[in-house]
Each structure stands twice: as structure tokens, then as C-alpha cells.
Amino acid sequence: MKQTWRWYGPNDPVTLSDVRQAGATGVVTALHHIPNGEIWSVDEIQKRKAIVEEAGLEWSVVESVPIHEDIKTHTGQYDLWIKNYQQTLRNLAQCGIYTVCYNFMPVLDWTRTDLEYVLPDGSKALRFDQIEFAAFELHILKRPGAEADYTAEEIAQAERRFATMSEEDKARLTRNIIAGLPGAEEGYTLDQFRQHLATYKDIDKAKLREHFAYFLKAIIPVAYEVGVRMAVHPDDPPRPILGLPRIVSTIEDMQWMVETVNSMANGFTMCTGSYGVRADNDLVDMIKQFGPRIYFTHLRSTLREENPKTFHEAAHLHGDVDMYEVVKAIVEEEHRRKAEGSDDLIPMRPDHGHQMLDDLKKKTNPGYSAIGRLKGLAEVRGVELAIQRAFFSK
């Protein structure tokens, strides 16, 4: 695997020098300062690429070129935004950047309720609490019809939880959910959030798939023409939330994508922490079935709690993800490619590390502090080395 590291640009508290010292050789970044839908010019791409290369690193993956909400709702200037997206892909290819991670999650990107969940050892993790989320949706957001998405017990628990919340608790929960997490391109006020949700009131899973198919049929041929590999990121969490459909959550969704646009430019980001939240997702089977189309991996683990829809981010080698078998399947796919004459390594980044040690005293991007990811990268690197030596050394 090619070891990479997510970097949020010049304002990231984790520097490129830190990234290099961590042992990564590739950088995963994006032009976050360019508004959604606007073209990334060759000049802007080259500026960022030069900064990365001056640090002795390579810009390996774009994460992400965000998709304008008009494209997802198939309204407004969606065709203009698609044309702009096509041009951005051409410009990236012109600059020698060929792997693009993206997602098709409506309104929200990845979602958590607690950004400072304290673990028994004193480090902090990200957590999604189903009951707190229900309390937000039922009693703060007050989304019409939300009760239908929860069991009677969850509704009762959410009411009790809400009754114990201080105003600061409510504000923090709201902020965590709607204000935008690292990598998310949108942040909202509560009223704006309600308005954006309303734009999806007539869009179910089938309709959102139609809009995604329209996007794929417009984008993938351009990507293929210029040599760009599109790697869709799964939904996080991988299930419908807030009445919004989710369409990249299961192996069936992956199969639908391949059947909709059967091009090798139409590929996947294997995010084990996102797919792994669902007990019915067999990560190793996903890798084996779609290995030739896996162009990027996010390696992390989560741990489901008593309510299986509640989870927190576990250490990289613990939790519900069998990281050994996942890494072994990825390495096997790389060796399959090598046997066919390709030296195409799969970029991997350690995803969402715990906030720990000295980082507990620093302001960090949630999930993206340095030391927790350094630990995760070192652990995964060790797993890969052991697998390479045990099964593939001559």
C-alpha cells in the first residue's frame, strides 16, 4: 500500500513536515478555499501541488472534489456544475493527479454526535450516539415525521436524554451535527439546515439514484478519457438519517454503481470505518469482489455499542473491523495487479485517530490530530509488513 496522510492545506495544524516524519510519502488534500461547484484552475492546482512537493511529498489523492447540492437534487444549475466538475477533472489530470475521492451524501457529510468521547485510557474519540441523535432530531430540529425512524424505546430514551441536557449540551450537540466536520464543505444554522432538508422532501432512494446515475454518466466518460480514477466514499453512517436517503452503504449499492456505468474509471474508496459500522457489511468480501476498482482506502475501526446504531471510533487494530484480514485482502489485490503487469499500489491513509498524549493540549481537527493517526499508520504498516513477509516474500 502507498502510505498517505490527509492534509487540510496550509491552515492545518498538522504540517507537511509532520506528515513526512510520520513516514507517509503521499498527501491527500483538496482545494477547500474554492467554493463548491467552481472549477479548480490549473494554476490553483499547481500551487497546491508545488507546496506538497517542496516538502518532499507527492499529492497522491484528491479528497474531495465536492459535488454541488444542485446535482444531488437535480435542480437549479446542475448541468453547469457538472460541466465545471468535468473541467476540474481535466485540469487535475493535466497536473498529473489521477485519483479523486468524492461522496454523494445529501446535505451532510460524515456525522457524529460527540467529538470528545473520553475513552478509559483518557484519550478522546469520535462517537455517534443513536439516542442523542434522536434527541436532536425529535426535540431540537423537530423534523416532521421523524418518529417513524425510531423505535418506541429509542423515542422514550431520547425524551429522557433531552430532559437532562443543559442549554450548552443542546448547543454543542447541534453544532456537532450541522456545523460541518473536517472535510465537509457545508455548515449550517438550524434554520438553514431545515431549509436544505426540505429540498429533499420528494427525493427517495430511487430518485437519488437517478440523480447519481445522471452524474456518473456525465462524469465517468470524461474521467476515463483523461485517466482519472473516481473513488466514491461510502455514506457515514451507512444508513438513512434525517429522512435523507443514502445510496452508497452496502455491497448491493456498489454493484448498482458498476452496473449503472461499467467503466474502470468508476471505482471505490474502501473506508472500513464507514462500511464497517454495519454488521451486515463483509469488508473482506467487498474487497475481493470489487478489488480491481478499489483505488483508495481509509483504514480505521469502529465499535458498535449496546444499541447497534451507536458506535465510537476504536483503535485501528481493535473494534469490529478485522484489520488483519482487510489489509491482507488489499495486499492480495495489489499482488494480483502486479502479476498482470501493473505496479499500481493502492493509496492508504490512517483514518480518524484518537486525540491523545500531547495532542490533548492542542486545538485539532476532530478525528485528524497527529499522534493518533501516527499510531494508526505505524500499526497498519506493521500489519502489512508481516503479511508481505509471511505470504509474499521469496
UniProtKB/Swiss-Prot annotation:
Xref: InterPro entries: Man_deHydtase (IPR004628), Xyl_isomerase-like_sf (IPR036237)
Family: Belongs to the mannonate dehydratase family.
One Pfam match: UxuA
Main function: Catalyzes the dehydration of D-mannonate.
GO molecular function annotations of the record: ferrous iron binding; manganese ion binding; mannonate dehydratase activity
Any Gene Ontology biological process: D-glucuronate catabolic process
Pathway field: Carbohydrate metabolism; pentose and glucuronate interconversion
Catalytic activity: D-mannonate = 2-dehydro-3-deoxy-D-gluconate + H2O
Keywords, ordered alphabetically: Iron, Lyase, Manganese
SUPFAM superfamilies associated with the record: Xylose isomerase-like (SSF51658)
Protein name: Mannonate dehydratase
Cofactor(s) the protein requires to work: Fe(2+); Mn(2+)
Primary enzyme class: lyase
Natural source organism: Salmonella paratyphi C (strain RKS4594)
Enzyme Commission identifier(s): 4.2.1.8
Entry-linked NCBIfam families: PRK03906.1, uxuA
Record bears the keyword Lyase: yes
